[in-house]
């Protein structure tokens, strides 16, 4: 939990959406609104130009909602892989899909009050029976978890 909420472990992922239930339920829409920033700040953006905020921007607010003596009743976080990383995965895996065919690669994190579950997901803009992208994404996530010393089954 510390690697998710306190450390920078997931900071390069984009946030699609999140919700957390403590004394109330809080919903977070991960869509990024660059018009909120000053011109100088907006010019420094790269990854977030794809329409979603980086987890590193939202993590402090999410963490603030978890602080206190009580554990959250539940939370759900949906991360998306940044488009340039999707492209890199496609190239590295030798898949025939183009980045335009991929709507998103997702990491769903669900906490039910006692256990944390991570599930991968893919969304394509085209129909395909090929499961190569799903296998490549799962493999990439396994390597990521291993590298970050996050236990998984």
Show which residues each predicted segment covers.
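Generic alpha-helix detector with strongest preference for long hydrophobic helices that associate
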Residues: 4, 13, 17, 58, ...
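General N-terminal targeting signals
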Residues: 27, 32, 37-40, 45, ...
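Phenylalanine-focused residue identity feature
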Residues: 10-13, 23-26, 32, 36, ...
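Mixed-charge, glycine-accented linear interaction segment located at domain edges/termini
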Residues: 116-153
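Charge-rich, low-complexity N-terminal segments
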Residues: 1-57
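Surface-exposed, low-hydrophobicity interaction/linker segments
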Residues: 49-115
């Amino acid at each position: 939990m510390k690697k998710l909420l306190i450390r920078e472990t997931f900071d390069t992922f984009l946030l699609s959406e999140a919700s957390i239930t403590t004394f109330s339920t809080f919903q977070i829409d991960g869509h990024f609104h660059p018009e909120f920033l000053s011109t100088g700040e907006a010019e420094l953006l790269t990854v977030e130009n794809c329409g979603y905020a980086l987890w590193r921007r939202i993590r402090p607010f999410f963490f603030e909602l978890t602080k206190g003596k009580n554990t959250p009743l539940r939370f759900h976080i949906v991360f998306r892989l940044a488009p340039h990383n999707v492209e890199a995965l496609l190239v590295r895996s030798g898949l025939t899909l183009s980045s335009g065919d991929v709507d998103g690669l997702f990491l769903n994190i669900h906490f039910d009050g006692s256990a944390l579950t991570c599930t991968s997901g893919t969304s394509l803009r085209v129909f395909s029976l090929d499961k190569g992208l799903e296998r490549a994404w799962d493999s990439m996530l396994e390597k990521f978890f291993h590298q970050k010393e996050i236990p998984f089954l």
